[in-house]
Amino acid sequence: IIISISLSIAYYLYNSKKEYESYTIKLEEYRKERNNFLNNSSSSPLRNSPYKLSYYDPNVNFKVIASIMQKERIDTITLATSTGNSERFIDFATLNFKLGRSKFTLPVYKYLEGENKGDLFFCFLDKTNNNSTYPGGRYIDIEFENAKRIELDFNKSYNPYCVYNEEFSCPIPSKRNYIDMEIKAGEKLSK
């Protein structure tokens, strides 16, 4: 029995290490693509900017499965932007997830107008803001269509474009989007 348990533990640890290595490789590829776009695209906010992207080390503890609760009643919400204006969204759904031992429920919005009309928008604030990350929060690109669950990977969180270029107007997350912990994952401010 002891040998069987030891073999099971060794197998689990080996597979966990392999999964982590595979995940890290995929995340690094994602970051390289993002860096390539932001450093080379003519539509990039980093064009003519000295800003360099900086990331936290990959951390699989910040990759979670979130349950989706779509709203039965559609409301609109207005978020302030980095340029002092405001932008309207549909208060579309909530994501329920667990990080460590804490449970969180954060809203997902849908763009109501503009070039992103109909796209989902997930933003958050956390305890790293004003320290190692942008004070106005970070974003994660998500998509789902009639799904009940979604992978929410904070390692793919990024700074809004207004961090790199003041000409961009970026929605600022509301207090409903606050995660009461440090999310040391994804993009951070470069030093």
What kind of region is each of these model predictions?
Residues 1-12:
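Hydrophobic membrane-insertion alpha-helices, especially the h-region
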Residues 15-29:
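Ser/Thr/Pro/Gly-rich low-complexity linker/stalk segments immediately outside membranes or between
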Residues 21, 159-191:
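Extended, aromatic/histidine-rich regions of cofactor-dependent oxidoreductases associated
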Residues 33-87, 91:
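N-terminal secretory signal peptides
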Residues 69, 100, 125-127, 155-157, ...:
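Solvent-exposed coil/turn segments that connect beta secondary-structure elements
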Residues 74-136:
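Mid-length scaffold segments of soluble, non-membrane domains
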Residues 122-158:
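Acidic, glycine-rich flexible loop segments
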